[in-house]
Design a protein with these regions (language model features):
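Arg/Lys-rich, low-complexity, intrinsically disordered N-terminal tails that contact nucleic acids
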Residues: 1-6, 100-103
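Residue-level signal for well-ordered alpha-helical segments
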Residues: 2, 21-25, 29, 62-67
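Histidine-centered nuclease catalytic patch
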Residues: 10-41
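Cys/His-coordinated zinc-binding microdomains
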Residues: 15, 46-49
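Histidine (H) residue identity feature
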Residues: 23-27, 48-49, 53
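Polybasic, low-complexity binding patches
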Residues: 32-42, 50-103
Length: 103
């Protein structure tokens, strides 16, 4: 499925349009399949993809992507008020990334 986070084929972080790699916003075997089905993928340039997986800043980058992914998922699939939508996302992916109380 096409990304619901960012429709343009460019790096999520810097906007580069070359040397792109597809990144699944949600990790793990089950969540990766769900992310594919729900469109929770983004393109990253090779530099940012390596930085995400290898650097000390990777966790911050990963959390930013997860928050963007959850917000996009709620806009596309959520039903009800924001609290209900967050609960729906949490049920599907096991965690809420928008609510700081869950971190």
């Amino acid at each position: 499925m096409k990304s619901i986070i960012k429709s343009a084929r460019c790096c999520f972080f810097c906007g580069a349009e070359t040397n792109l790699e597809l990144h699944h916003v949600m990790h793990g075997t089950a969540n990766r399949r769900l992310a594919d089905a729900d469109g929770l993928t983004v393109y990253l340039c090779s530099r940012h993809h390596r930085e995400l997986h290898d650097s000390k800043n990777g966790a911050d980058m990963d959390n930013a992507l997860k928050r963007a992914g959850e917000y996009a998922w709620i806009k596309k699939y959520g039903k009800g008020n924001m609290e209900q939508c967050i609960a729906q996302f949490r049920q599907r992916y096991g965690k809420n990334y928008l609510d700081l109380e869950d971190e």
